[in-house]
Amino acid sequence: MDLQLLYFTSIFSIFIFMFMTHKIVTKKSNSTPSLPPGPWKLPIIGNMHNLVGSPLPHHRLRDLSAKYGSLMHLKLGEVSTIVVSSPEYAKEVMKTHDHIFASRPYVLAAEIMDYDFKGVAFTPYGDYWRQLRKIFALELLSSKRVQSFQPIREEVLTSFIKRMATIEGSQVNVTKEVISTVFTITARTALGSKSRHHQKLISVVTEAAKISGGFDLGDLYPSVKFLQHMSGLKPKLEKLHQQADQIMQNIINEHREAKSSATGDQGEEEVLLDVLLKKEFGLSDESIKAVIWDIFGGGSDTSSATITWAMAEMIKNPRTMEKVQTEVRRVFDKEGRPNGSGTENLKYLKSVVSETLRLHPPAPLLLPRECGQACEINGYHIPAKSRVIVNAWAIGRDPRLWTEAERFYPERFIERSIEYKSNSFEFIPFGAGRRMCPGLTFGLSNVEYVLAMLMYHFDWKLPKGTKNEDLGMTEIFGITVARKDDLYLIPKTVHN
């Protein structure tokens, strides 16, 4: 009898224990906010199958968000990923909770090429980032500093225009010419006078950009280190890094020697390398090289892609090109010659650049952010260490936000006052908040001035047999999203 009583007592105790445990777990589960909605996850790969077969991830993510919501959860390999596709949620990430989402996730290419995250773009949020950001804002790329580079821009653009004039009436690869010109401007403003090293560095930057775009398996499975080698990306990046490091170190050494010797160019304008070498900043050579790499990578591809997209859109919309040419020629003729300060009066040209960036942001998914600590957004749980992707391209083409969203219509930026640095999160081609692109002023100055010179000096048309409306606008995805096909046009000189 005692054994039977003990048996039933034990069974009853186990039942009570299991019942209470279930209630506690259920209560805890109900009190914890759920993750944002998203497609069904498969074991091991998560949602990677949802992106397979799409060469343009920003398009595929827009389509998935239309089904699951503008705050969407994906599991890409091992990485918990939050996709933001509306200005309301973009504001939550880049303003309301900006301090939580101010860091960057692990990216293999940034670790290798950026000297273990020593550049401003991918360095973790903290004191070192604050130091770099302050140097960028107050010294490196301030409005005053960017204006001081105007003589360099004018010199480079004058050579470019003369070269175009000599081949008037012939077919020109505008894409190639613009890339070369913008890289040259960047090299001269960052490193100083023409150097035998400039073209070598440009070649390495271009090659690194080609192989670093898109999602890499090593980034999606950070705990499985051998995948970095299996994909072949790591050894390729390490080889390019060695080349870039040697080139940039030679440039730094030669710059130091030139400045310390009597043969140095005493009359030259201070360039970005001069600023970085100032002793009061206390930057190591590795930090300086990482920043130079960021300036080349972030300031050249993006600007040249934007210029080429703008030219293509104006060719498809001749009325827009005519309005830009009329404005540019009126303003510059009044001032006697083309100059950088005159671009401030080119309101319509600026609206063309804004409309180009709305439809074709060079980094459509911006740079990824990382959630520093678990938080809630609109009742949804965002786990710590989640990678956050903001689809600026989808926001810029959302028909709920923009009338005739797919139409190229620069006048919308004259009719509505929307600025790059405003609190309007429906237009964020440069990001927003703490991690907003620090090179915004530098990049826009280059884009606006190059376009102004192209519109002032030349009329442009497509090669014979190609109609404006048939011009292809297909994208190719990479670190920067550019036109898939090079743009070929025929210039006709208007102003020598």
UniProtKB/Swiss-Prot annotation:
Protein name: Cytochrome P450 71D9
Listed GO MF terms: heme binding; iron ion binding; monooxygenase activity; oxidoreductase activity, acting on paired donors, with incorporation or reduction of molecular oxygen
Cofactors (names): heme
Pfam families: p450
UniProt entry keywords in alphabetical sequence: Heme, Iron, Metal-binding, Monooxygenase, Oxidoreductase
InterPro entries membership: Cyt_P450, Cyt_P450_CS, Cyt_P450_E_grp-I, Cyt_P450_sf
NAD in keyword set: no
Superkingdom of the source species: Eukaryota
UniProt EC number: 1.14.-.-
Induction, per UniProt: By fungal elicitor.
Binding site for heme: C437
Similarity comment: Belongs to the cytochrome P450 family.
Claim: Iron is one of the keywords in the record: yes
